[in-house]
Curated annotation (Swiss-Prot):
GO MF term set: carbohydrate transmembrane transporter activity; maltose binding
Subcellular location per the Swiss-Prot or TrEMBL entry: Periplasm
Keyword Magnesium attributed: no
Name of the molecule in the record: Maltose/maltodextrin-binding periplasmic protein
UniProt-listed InterPro entries: Maltose/Cyclodextrin-bd, SBP, SBP_1_CS
């Protein structure tokens, strides 16, 4: 193994020398890796992985976390500039790939097998792999162990639980009803879907927003509101405050919410989202991914860094120790992280969920479904009319 690594590093050094002499005009510096990652992620940990890479190869790695990098990247990459590697949630990468800004990646089968298969689906665009999946985010049911030691397994149990808790001055469940990202798991459980995914691509005309299953899910949500088990005006901050003050027994949120709950000292657990009609809730799954700039002259170096330095147990551990990654795509490191039941639950919900489509048409989906849920929840429209309108807006 050591000989192989040594040979690989020699080959990379030779490649770098060749690249230096090849083109002095490229905007992206050759023989150096520049990485962009968001400021809320473990960029110091990533820089440590970069130091190890530099020590082994002599190639300097610079980790930057510019503001609004997801908007800056397409602007600079279109002119042949920007970072060699960009980290962001996978759903932005479809538009980048459509504009020709990301290099196709070609990991071998042995490397692909190290990751959970569903994570590769997140970084496929028109049948090609356009990034490496790194970490996995999905909503889970978060519950107050002192109020509900055994959280409900089904949505159908929630009205009776709420009745019992109301008698004690509490409520069963509060979560953000203003954003479809949070309401979608229930709407999708019985067969709703955003865009049909077939043969490695999305069919933008095959939308499941006004399917029978979506109507059943939204009708159940509207009934919870009509029967005063939930309030149509609940948004993210209202739900978070109610849970963290111990006023409501459960909420639906992701790993980013855990640190505030930790500070609130609520005795909480994270578990599977409830089933609806016997079927699992289907949260949208976001995958933090690493793409390689199509304009980079350092594509082989970027591949070496990502596959053999970052996407290893020690590499991911360095980033995770800086800022928790949540669940991860690499099986061996996920198995270590799953000792934390919160992370095991995140991955279990993700595996039952729906990969967030990485296509530009998602902006129309978010807008239309948001309006539909708000209108149905506030009784401005019937469920059928609201979802029919949404379907029309998305497919027009």
């Amino acid at each position: 193994m050591k000989i192989k690594t040594g040979a690989r590093i020699l080959a990379l050094s030779a490649l770098t020398t060749m690249m230096f002499s090849a083109s002095a005009l490229a905007k992206i510096e050759e023989g150096k890796l520049v990485i962009w990652i968001n400021g809320d992620k473990g960029y110091n940990g990533l820089a440590e992985v970069g130091k190890k890479f530099e020590k082994d190869t002599g190639i300097k790695v610079s980790v930057e976390h510019p503001d609004k990098l997801e908007e800056k990247f397409p602007q600079v990459a279109a002119t042949g500039d920007g970072p060699d590697i960009i980290f962001w949630a996978h759903d932005r990468f479809g538009a980048y790939a459509q504009s020709g800004l990301l290099a196709e990646i070609t990991p071998d089968k042995a490397f692909q097998d190290k990751l959970y298969p569903f994570t590769w689906d997140a970084v496929r665009y028109n049948g090609k792999l356009i990034a490496y999946p790194v970490a996995v985010e999905a909503l889970s049911l978060i519950y107050n162990k002192d109020l509900v030691p055994n959280p409900p397994k089904t949505w159908e149990e929630i009205p009776a639980l709420d009745k019992a808790l109301k008698a004690k001055g509490k409520s069963a469940l509060m979560f953000n009803l203003q954003e479809p990202y949070f309401t979608w798991p229930l709407i999708a459980a019985d067969g709703g879907y955003a865009f049909k995914f077939e043969n490695g691509k999305y069919d933008v005309k095959n939308v499941g927003v006004d399917s029978a299953g979506a109507k059943a899910g939204l009708t159940f949500l509207v009934d919870l509101i009509k029967n005063k088990h939930m309030n149509a005006d609940t948004d993210y901050s209202i739900a978070e405050a109610a849970f963290n003050k111990g006023e409501t027994a459960m909420t639906i949120n992701g790993p980013w919410a855990w640190s505030n709950i930790d500070k609130s000292k609520v005795n909480y657990g994270v578990t599977l989202l409830p089933t609806f009609k016997g079927k699992p809730s289907k949260p949208f799954v976001g995958v933090l991914s690493a793409g390689i700039n199509a304009a980079s002259p350092n594509k082989e170096l970027a591949k070496e860094f990502l596959e053999n330095y970052l996407m290893t147990d020690p590499g991911l551990e360095a980033v995770n120790n800086d800022k928790p990654l949540g669940a991860v795509a690499v099986k061996s490191f996920q198995e270590k992280l799953e000792k934390d039941p919160r992370i095991a639950a995140t991955m279990a919900n993700a595996q039952k969920g729906e990969i967030m489509p990485n296509i530009p048409q998602m902006s129309a989906f978010w807008y239309a479904v948001r309006t539909a849920v708000i209108n149905a929840a506030s009784a401005r429209q019937t469920v059928d009319a609201a979802l029919k309108d949404a379907q029309g807006r998305i497919t027009k």
